[in-house]
């Protein structure tokens, strides 16, 4: 299984640190040349591999960690995303709900990435929290997942556990996606909730 993070701002780097912490190799890409962020990637760890966008999207599981607006530009990198899992880490800050047809922002992302199996997740934590070791006082930091594809959600749940988190599935995008979205000025009830689960 191969992994990529598209977007290397605060959230993208926080995700990369989670992969590095657990010795899992991941490609990172932006719309810029990989040389422009190679030193930042190297500072996180040797398993963080800078790539061109066209190469990074060959991965099996892709974390979309860009601002909401450019997600449609990233979606144009491939004619079809069939067979790939997209983890939507975006938040539609300031995007009026009417621009999204009243639907969850994750539904709009799913429509842009034709054929992909989309899982909404890892977006409800701010970067400063997401980048921390998720092992907290004997428990594990919670990440919420929502998807219309149960098998994809299960796969990302396993990955989340391998990264040290405790995944909680919220159901489909229309229900669970609404709970963890920041869309326009209406925020879901679970957005930015930093919770720890004790087994």
Question: What kind of region is each of these model predictions?
Answer:
Residues 27, 97-100, 166:
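Structural/interface elements that position substrates and couple domains in central-metabolism enzymes
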Residues 1-39, 43:
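NAD(P)+-binding Rossmann beta1-loop-alpha1 motif at the extreme N-terminus of oxidoreductases
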Residues 90-136:
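Rossmann-fold NAD(P)-binding glycine/threonine-rich loop
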Residues 140-199:
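Active-site-lining helix/loop region of Rossmann-like oxidoreductase modules
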Residues 45-85, 89-95:
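Rossmann-like NAD(P)-binding element
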Residues 1-2, 85, 142:
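Residues that mark the start of a beta-strand
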Residues 50, 117-123, 168-172:
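General beta-strand structural signal in soluble alpha/beta enzymes
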